[in-house]
C-alpha cells in the first residue's frame, strides 16, 4: 500500500493539473462567505491586521480577499507550484510500523529524481515596536466580546515559551487558571480565556472575554487586566508553575505516543525551521 501511495503522490507533485479548479474555487468561496458573519474569525482578522501591519501574518489571510477569489490567476498558481513545490522545500513525514530501509529505497525511487531549485528570495519583514494601544471595533450579529492581544516572539523562542506559560497560568483546563478561578467560576463574565500562538516569524498572546448581559466591554476589560496584574506581581499559588510544566511534559509524551502526534511534531518542526 505504501508503494501505491508513493506512486500517486509522485504524480501529484510532478505536474499541476487544475481539472477541478472551478469546483474547488466554489468550495473556497462558500467557506469565505461563511466567514463573513463569523464573529470569531472577524475579530481574529482585525486583531492580526493591527498586530502585524506589515507582515503577511496580518495582511494575508489563508482564504484571501473577495477580489482574489473573483479573479484567480491560473498562471500565478502554476508559477507558485513551480517555485515552491520543490524537493528542497518539502519534507516527507512517515510514521508507523515501517521497514525503514525498504521505505527509504521506495521514497528514493519515486521522489529521488525531483530536481533541486533555488527558492525565490524573500526579504525578512520587520515590524515596528508597538508604542500605543490600538483599538478596533468589529460589527457582527453575535454577542459582544473583547479580545486583547500583544505581539510576541517567534515559535520555539524563549519568549514564546514564556507566553505559553503565562497563558497556562491564566487558563488551565478550565479549572485552575486565574481566569478560571477568579472570573469564570465566580460568574463575573460568561466566559474568558487566554491563549498564545507562535508563528514562523513573530507570535501573539491574547485574552478573550464575553461579558454578561448589561455588563460593558470596559468592565469586562478591567476584569482581564486585574488578572494580568496578578501574574505580573506573582500573585498565584507556588505549585501552579511546576504543575503546568509537568502537565506540558505529560501532554508531549502522550502526543508522541500516537502516530498523528509524532507526525505533527515532526512536520511542525520542519515548517518552523527548528
Where do the PLM segments sit?
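M16 family metallopeptidases and their MPP-like homologs
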Residues: 1-11, 40-67, 89-95, 144-154, ...
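Active-site-adjacent, His/Asp/Glu-enriched structural segments that form or flank metal-binding
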Residues: 1-41, 56-57, 68-89, 106-109, ...
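Surface-exposed patches in mature extracellular/periplasmic domains of secreted proteins
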Residues: 16-24, 119-120, 234-240
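PPIase-associated folding chaperone regions across multiple families
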Residues: 21, 158-165, 184
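An aromatic/glycine/proline-enriched structural segment found at the starts
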Residues: 54, 62, 91-154, 255-256
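Short beta-strand/turn micro-motifs at beta-sheet edges
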Residues: 78-82, 133-137, 191-197
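Short, solvent-exposed loop/turn segments at the edges of secondary structure
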Residues: 85-88, 129-132, 140-145, 160-161, ...
Amino acid at each position: 500500500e505504501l508503494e501505491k501511495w508513493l506512486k500517486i503522490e509522485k504524480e501529484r507533485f510532478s505536474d499541476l493539473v487544475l481539472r477541478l479548479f472551478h469546483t474547488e474555487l466554489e468550495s473556497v468561496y462558500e467557506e469565505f462567505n461563511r466567514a463573513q458573519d463569523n464573529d470569531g474569525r472577524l475579530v481574529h482578522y482585525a486583531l492580526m491586521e493591527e498586530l502585524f501591519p506589515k507582515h503577511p501574518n496580518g495582511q494575508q489571510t489563508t482564504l484571501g480577499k473577495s477580489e482574489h477569489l473573483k479573479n484567480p490567476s491560473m498562471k500565478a498558481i502554476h508559477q507558485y507550484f513551480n517555485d515552491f513545490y520543490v524537493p528542497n522545500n518539502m519534507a516527507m513525514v512517515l510514521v508507523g510500523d515501517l521497514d525503514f530501509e525498504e521505505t527509504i529505497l521506495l521514497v528514493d525511487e519515486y521522489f529521488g529524481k525531483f530536481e533541486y531549485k533555488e527558492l525565490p528570495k524573500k526579504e525578512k519583514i520587520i515590524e515596528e515596536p508597538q508604542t500605543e494601544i490600538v483599538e478596533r471595533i468589529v460589527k457582527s450579529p453575535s454577542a459582544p466580546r473583547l479580545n486583547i492581544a500583544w505581539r510576541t516572539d517567534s515559535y520555539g523562542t524563549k519568549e514564546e515559551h514564556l507566553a505559553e506559560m503565562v497563558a497556562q497560568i491564566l487558563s488551565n483546563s478550565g479549572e485552575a487558571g486565574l481566569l478560571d478561578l477568579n472570573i469564570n467560576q465566580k460568574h463575573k463574565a460568561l466566559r474568558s480565556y487566554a491563549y498564545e500562538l507562535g508563528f514562523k516569524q513573530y507570535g501573539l498572546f491574547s485574552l478573550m472575554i464575553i461579558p454578561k448581559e448589561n455588563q460593558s466591554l470596559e468592565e469586562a476589560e478591567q476584569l482581564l487586566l486585574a488578572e494580568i496584574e496578578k501574574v505580573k506581581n506573582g500573585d498565584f499559588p507556588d505549585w501552579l508553575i511546576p504543575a503546568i510544566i509537568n502537565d506540558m511534559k505529560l501532554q508531549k509524551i502522550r502526543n508522541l505516543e500516537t502516530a498523528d502526534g509524532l507526525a505533527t511534531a515532526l512536520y511542525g518542526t520542519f515548517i518552523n525551521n527548528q
